[in-house]
């Protein structure tokens, strides 16, 4: 029997709920939790009866398995360990100096508990270092006050406690509290917060080691296969999008995706931060105060920090407000999540927007290998080249600190994977060209006198005036015979004749199928067409799976799985490329062969169906 991943997770949740509500002893419940998790992992990855010999071909990779486990654990993130309340009470009584802070962890939602616990651990860790400093002070004297003021700056979370040193002139009480805090820190590291099943929904040590080795190899490959990006071309293309008139964007995710991409490229923020969670306030022309960073397990973090903007900060704020004013974006902010949904709210939203945003990235770079998240690494590289050596803020920091703080990484090692892009033709004084010129409109005006003779009456003149009006409102407007026919209710042959006559002026060529396509694609921003940072192909491709693709993945959960069962061949489609409003380029692989199709279609689904029909029938 084959079932979808989403149903597999729902079944796991149902089983855990039944165990939790039963009147079994807690030890028996824990064993059953572990058994349910083991059954889930066997179905997805670990069953040796299915996944051996030829069956290994059907098994997902370690990277995907890790992602699936994470998705399964997310269904239990708002549940706490059964012993958590009792453990909190015990710890509170054992460490009276911190009793109130510890009690504050109880009776809170699980995500708040994790945030508060992390803050407390950070506070106590700084206290370990402070204890060493206090021990060297000796008897508190007026001359010691300067040292205490200095310590308050170094350890701001202990400022109130340090103030008592001056008033009491005795460090004994604070020393005792800090010593108690050191013991508490050890106790908190042993505290079980998560529900029992979450500890069982993890990889085996051998699989974790293999996954780490694979990630290390991928990072090693990336660092030796730098991708060169044309800096002027990148900045100019970003600027062109941000200066498009409002009318150039329709109220749909597909139409707004290039604008969201450009804003992410200018700020280095994640897609969810641009669309929903991020709060931005311009400090000066090139610095923005940012808060609302998306976090794993921590939902959205509070507080703000300063980031650079690659464009004028005020322009960034204006275009962001324009983007978020559209109903297609507002709907994401007010999305209702089904009660049985096993994804987090941010994951559900990412599932809606991932494909159009990644499509926008491929069109922007003119490179099918590029994806939306590349903007963060490129942004970090540009910011480094522009400000690291010139901004006094980084005078005493190395580049690892720069990348870590700019990208908002808690772990400084995380930024190691964000250095695979190299800027070509970089010049810190280079500025993009912002022009009001409208060359296509000017070229069309040169053809005004041709229109009366192109068709009977004033039909061609009316078409011509309408097209010029569209270009006057939006110089980048895409003009097709389909649009002309739809808006002016004219004959197909007349619309096609007009497009053929004005093709040069419009910057298009008419193909053998009668469809208009751009005269030439803009150059790829990846200057070395052989540059490829996609080693560990399996890992990279699977990281870009959409949530819907994960949900629809089928697993065989029957007891008599056979090595001889062979999966039915299915086509694997690359990201569709939109040539114009109704023209598509579709590429796919089937049975080991590559196929492509280009033509008109009402939607991307229609285009994919036509591509399949033309190549297979």
Curated annotation (Swiss-Prot):
<feature type="binding site">
    <location>
        <position position="409"/>
    </location>
    <ligand>
        <name>DNA</name>
    </ligand>
</feature>
<feature type="active site" description="Nucleophile">
    <location>
        <position position="418"/>
    </location>
</feature>
<protein>
    <recommendedName>
        <fullName>Protelomerase</fullName>
        <ecNumber>3.1.22.-</ecNumber>
    </recommendedName>
</protein>
<keyword id="KW-0238">DNA-binding</keyword>
<keyword id="KW-1194">Viral DNA replication</keyword>
<dbReference type="InterPro" id="IPR055040">
    <property type="entry name" value="TelK_N"/>
</dbReference>
<comment type="similarity">
    <text>Belongs to the Caudoviricetes Protelomerase family.</text>
</comment>
<comment type="subunit">
    <text>Monomer. Homodimer; in presence of DNA.</text>
</comment>
<dbReference type="InterPro" id="IPR038280">
    <property type="entry name" value="ResT/TelK_cat_sf"/>
</dbReference>
<dbReference type="Pfam" id="PF20818">
    <property type="entry name" value="TelK_stirrup"/>
</dbReference>
<keyword id="KW-0235">DNA replication</keyword>
<dbReference type="GO" id="GO:0039693">
    <property type="term" value="P:viral DNA genome replication"/>
</dbReference>
<feature type="binding site">
    <location>
        <position position="376"/>
    </location>
    <ligand>
        <name>DNA</name>
    </ligand>
</feature>
<dbReference type="InterPro" id="IPR032047">
    <property type="entry name" value="ResT/TelK_cat"/>
</dbReference>
<keyword id="KW-0378">Hydrolase</keyword>
<feature type="region of interest" description="Disordered">
    <location>
        <begin position="535"/>
        <end position="575"/>
    </location>
</feature>
<dbReference type="GO" id="GO:0006260">
    <property type="term" value="P:DNA replication"/>
</dbReference>
<feature type="binding site">
    <location>
        <position position="270"/>
    </location>
    <ligand>
        <name>DNA</name>
    </ligand>
</feature>
<dbReference type="InterPro" id="IPR049454">
    <property type="entry name" value="TelK_stirrup"/>
</dbReference>
<dbReference type="InterPro" id="IPR049460">
    <property type="entry name" value="TelK_muzzle"/>
</dbReference>
<dbReference type="GO" id="GO:0003677">
    <property type="term" value="F:DNA binding"/>
</dbReference>
<dbReference type="GO" id="GO:0004519">
    <property type="term" value="F:endonuclease activity"/>
</dbReference>
<dbReference type="Pfam" id="PF22853">
    <property type="entry name" value="TelK_N"/>
</dbReference>
<feature type="compositionally biased region" description="Basic and acidic residues">
    <location>
        <begin position="563"/>
        <end position="575"/>
    </location>
</feature>
<feature type="binding site">
    <location>
        <position position="295"/>
    </location>
    <ligand>
        <name>DNA</name>
    </ligand>
</feature>
<keyword id="KW-0540">Nuclease</keyword>
<comment type="function">
    <text>Converts the circular intermediates produced by the viral replication and carrying a joined telomere site to a linear DNA molecule with covalently closed hairpin ends. The viral circular DNA is cleaved at a palindromic site called telRL thereby generating a linear prophage plasmid with telomeres. Binds covalently to the 3'-phosphoryl of the cleaved strands.</text>
</comment>
<dbReference type="Pfam" id="PF20849">
    <property type="entry name" value="TelK_muzzle"/>
</dbReference>
<keyword id="KW-0255">Endonuclease</keyword>
<feature type="compositionally biased region" description="Acidic residues">
    <location>
        <begin position="535"/>
        <end position="562"/>
    </location>
</feature>
<dbReference type="Pfam" id="PF16684">
    <property type="entry name" value="ResT-TelK_cat"/>
</dbReference>
